[in-house]
Structure formats: C-alpha cells, structure tokens
A protein has these predicted regions:
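Conserved AMP-binding A3 loop
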Residues: 37-41, 170-194
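Conserved AMP-binding/adenylation subdomain of ANL enzymes
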Residues: 193-210, 218-258, 273-274
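Conserved AMP-binding/adenylate-forming core of the ANL superfamily
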Residues: 6, 26-72, 76-80, 97-102, ...
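Conserved pre-ATP/AMP-binding loop-to-beta segment of ANL
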Residues: 7, 22-25, 155-174, 181, ...
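ANL superfamily adenylate-forming
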Residues: 32-36, 118-166, 273-274
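AMP-binding/adenylate-forming catalytic domain of the ANL superfamily
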Residues: 478-500, 517, 522-524
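Gly/Ser/Thr-rich phosphate-binding loop
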Residues: 254-262, 273-335, 347, 354
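AMP-binding/adenylate-forming catalytic core of the ANL superfamily
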Residues: 96, 113, 260, 361, ...
Length: 524
C-alpha cells in the first residue's frame, strides 16, 4: 500500500528518472550570482527530509503551507517535499501587495510559511502578522522564525507516504476570477500526474534536454511547462533568479539550452538585443514556446527570423484547466494565430451565450486535470464548474481543420505580460485616492506586454492631481503589472443612454489616444 501511495503522490513524480540517472545534474541554480547544482539524488534526499521535518513539526496531511519564495532550488524542494508529507503547498505570487498576500494566507488557514527574505520586501512582516504554527526562514535568522536549513538537518525517522485518493488535493495555485480577486484552485495528485504524462505525449522532453527558466516559479508557465516535464524525463534546467534580456540570452548560450518557454514580453525584450543575440552560439537551442497571453503573429515571425533554426510555437493554457489545445499528433503545421487542435484525451466544447454548442463561443474543458473547485469560493465554483466542465471564460472559434483561434474574453479581463488584470480592480485602486471622482480603465495595445491598463480619470474640482502622481499612487498600493501605464485627466466620462459609463466608447478613445505610444514603449 505504501508503494501505491508513493506512485499516486505528485511529490514523487520523477521516481523513474531518479532510478535511471540519480547522479545526473537536474538543476543549475543561479540564485545569488553563483552556480548551485543539484543532482536527482540530492533533490530526492532533501524533499524526503522536508517531508520528515513536517511530520516532526506536527504538520498533518491536508494542512496548507504558504510559500513566499523566489526563483531558487528551495522552492522546488519545498513544493514537492510538502506533498510527500501530504501537506498542501500554496506557491504564492510574490508580486502581489502585502495586504493581498496576507488575506490569501489567512483565508487558506495556513499553518506554516516558508519565507525567503529576498522575495518580497514585506515577507517577514506578512508571516509575523498571521497566526501560523510555524515560520521557516531561508538564509537568515529572525525572532519568531525557525532557520530552514537547521530544521532540515534535525534527525527525524523515515515516514510512509500518506494515503492518496482520487480527489486528494496536491497543491493550491492562485488565479484570478471574474471579480479579479485571487482564488485558490484545488488541484489533485491524480490530475497532476495525469497531466505530466499528457504533456510528455504532445510536448515531449528527453534526458538530453536542458531548459531555461527565467519566469517566476509560482507561474504555471514555469512549473507546468518546464520543471515537471524536464524532471519527469530525466533532463535538466537552468534556474535564473529573474528575467533580464541579455542575461537570458547568455544563459541559453552558456548552458547550451535546448528549449525555453516564456510570455510574449520575454521574447519581445530580447529581440531588442539582436546584435548581442547574433554574437552568441545558440546552435543547441531547438524550440521555444510563447504562452500565457495572446501572441501577435508578428512576434512569432520576428523570433523565427532572429533564430531560423529554432521551432517557435504558441500555447494556450489555464492554471485550473491545463492546456487542452495542442499540436496535431500527425505533424500537420499549426496555422499562425492558433495554439492547435483539441486533444483526444480532453473533452472540449464551444457554447454560445445560451449554453448551446456553437462554432464560436466560450471554451469548456473537461479532463482529470481540471480543478475540483476554488477554495472557500462556493459561488465561483458553481459558476465555473458544471458536471466536471470548466467554463474557461475564453471565446474561441474553430476552423474546418479543427484548429482553434482565440477571439476574446467573456468578461473584460485582459492579460498584461502573462498576468491577469481586471479593469474594476484598477478602478477601485484609483477610486481610493481622495482626489479621484470617477475613473474607467481599459486595455491598450503594447509592444512588449500585449496589453497594458490605461485610464480616464475625473479629478475632484480644484484638484491639481497629475497623471504621474496617480501612476505612482497605484504602483505603491497595488501589483506593478496592474498599474495604469497611461492616464488621461478628463472633465467627464462617456456615458450611455442609461447613464452608465460607456466602456466601449472609453476603450475606443483610450486606444486612439495611447495605442501608438504604447506600441513604442518597450520594457515598461
């Protein structure tokens, strides 16, 4: 029974690679400016030590543990080591404001937090403000925190893998819903292991592959797109602390990486360094995938021109629904603007506003990967999940050859550099300023981010508040990716016949005023 539970636990997903290549380097970590290499054997040993530490500290199966950690090997060790003890890790978006992170950890009733003091300026104060049973600290010591490495070194007996049922939760990533409020997706061990095998069929990795991660590890693009497939196959990857275009290109060349994944901004920004790119030996690079947001065909073309020997593709996926669209297994080329066709292992539907099957409509997905629901969000769970079908909120159409094409969102959410932005969320931030009377936010095109927030603001009479002051205000109080890049101070907002803000008119005016500027503003 213990062996069965081990095989059903996502924390042991790379067991086959561990047996084949135990002493092969799995991760080359560049955190702190120096290389730290971890073999498969070392990863397994430290994950097992984390599971034993959890039992010694009284962390029980089913309890949630928070992760305020940046891009470093400890993130991966803790993430999967937690699952080996039956705990449920929360890989948190360290770009969020302190108040939002505090709310998430408190709402999830986390009993422990692993804190990386370099990940968030308020990381320690966030952990201190919550009624956690235990607080673990990386790299440092501080009152009220246990030093992570010292605790890991404490002797602890071997443990049996906990019982894993079909619906046992593995981890809880956070995504944004129709309200823009982060919500925790309940992801199961069974669904995640099913997806690892599914991913290997359509986007196969090999022992000879070496990936490069510059995106945040809390993001699905990194965990689902590189960490799991590479470790499952027995390959290796380079882990960068963050993204900087020249360092990224240098990493691809120096470590002879065979593939890399990223959001559109990653590719747009490194294309600004074409001369440097051309000076590097990138002959090992075989494929690159762009995902997490709509990809302009012009960007795909530009990357292929810069790297003609590299296969460049786009992908579509959701935190709570996986990647239901994939390249055809028969090798047919994927048309520009399409992430692919429906996989036979995954049920998909397009429905119109009446819930009827249609040639164009909202994409619905059903497969073992789909989340069971959203933690402490019964109403959103009822809205998004019906009989196992996930309502993605994305409008697609399908051509006669079965290829899908993204059209828009059901709601007005948009993606800014791979991060979900909700206009209402940004508007509420603007409304919090005492000099703001009214505001409307809409997406405008941007060369790097795809879309960025722009705002029309009506100020209090007599106020001298400026657009730059309001930008700084939003940057200080909300996530950086959601702050309005452009603000127009106007005497009034466009209204429709019912006296409500005419968002369509506001969008048209903002795009007319700022689209050209936004397209030329790179790296914001």
């Amino acid at each position: 029974m213990g062996r069965d539970n081990r095989q059903r636990n996502l924390g042991y997903f790379f067991d086959h690679a561990l047996k084949r290549v135990p002493d092969k380097i799995a991760i080359i970590d560049l955190f702190g400016g120096a290389e730290r290499c971890s073999t498969y054997r070392r990863l397994d040993t430290r994950m097992e030590s984390i599971a034993r530490m959890f039992v010694r500290l009284g962390i029980r199966p089913g309890e949630r543990v928070a992760m305020l950690v940046g891009n470093r090997t400890e993130f991966i060790e803790f993430f999967f080591g937690s699952m080996r003890a039956g705990a449920i890790p929360l890989p948190l978006n360290i770009r969020l404001a302190a108040a939002t992170l505090t709310d998430i950890i408190g709402d999830a009733a986390c009993v422990l937090a692993l804190v990386d003091p370099t990940a968030h300026r308020d990381a320690l104060s966030i952990a201190r403000s919550l009624p956690l049973r235990q607080r673990l600290l990386l790299d440092d010591t501080s009152e009220g925190f246990l030093p992570f490495e010292s605790e890991l070194a404490q002797p602890a007996p071997a443990i049996e893998p906990p019982v894993i049922e079909d619906n046992t939760q593995a981890f809880q990533p956070y995504t944004s819903g129709s309200t823009g409020r982060p919500k925790g997706a309940i992801m199961t061990h069974r669904g995640m292991l099913w997806y690892v095998a599914y991913n290997q069929r359509y986007w196969p990795s090999a022992e000879s592959d070496r990936g490069l991660i510059a995106l945040p590890l809390f993001h699905k693009n990194a965990l689902r797109g590189t960490v799991k497939p590479v470790l499952y196959a027995g390959g290796s990857f380079v882990l960068m602390p963050g993204y900087e275009p020249r360092a990224y290109l240098e990493g691809l060349a120096k470590y002879k990486c065979t593939y890399s994944r990223g959001v559109a901004a990653v590719f747009t920004m490194f294309l600004q360094h074409r001369d440097y790119l051309q000076s590097l030996d990138l002959s090992a690079l075989r494929s690159m995938t762009i995902g997490s947001a709509v990809v302009a065909p012009e960007l795909l073309d530009a990357v292929e021109r810069a790297l003609p020997h590299v296969k460049v593709s786009e992908s579509y996926g959701l935190t709570e629904g996986g990647s239901p669209l994939r390249p055809p297994i028969d090798g047919r080329p994927v048309p520009r603007g399409s992430p692919g066709v429906a996989a036979p292992e995954i049920e998909v539907r397009l429905i119109d506003s009446q819930g009827k099957d249609a040639d164009e409509g909202e994409l619905l997905v059903r497969c073992p990967y789909v989340c069971l629901g959203y933690y402490n969000e019964p109403e959103i769970t009822r809205q998004k999940l019906h009989d196992g079908w996930l309502h993605t909120g994305d409008i697609f159409c399908k051509d006669n050859d079965g290829f899908f094409y993204f059209r828009s969102r059901v709601d007005d959410m948009f993606s800014c550099g791979g991060e979900n932005v909700y206009p209402k969320e940004v508007e509420n931030l603007l409304f919090a300023h005492p000099d703001v009377v009214n505001a409307v936010v809409a997406p405008v095109p941007h060369a790097v981010k795809g879309f960025v927030p722009a705002a029309m603001v009506v100020a209090r009479q007599g106020s001298t508040i400026s657009a730059n002051t309001l930008k700084a205000y939003c940057l200080e109080r909300g996530p950086a990716y959601a702050h309005p890049r452009f603000i127009a101070m106007v005497p009034s907002l466009p209204l429709n016949g019912a006296g409500k803000i005419d968002r369509g008119m506001a969008l048209a005016r903002l795009r007319d005023a700022f689209a050209a500027q936004a397209t030329n503003r790179v790296g914001e």
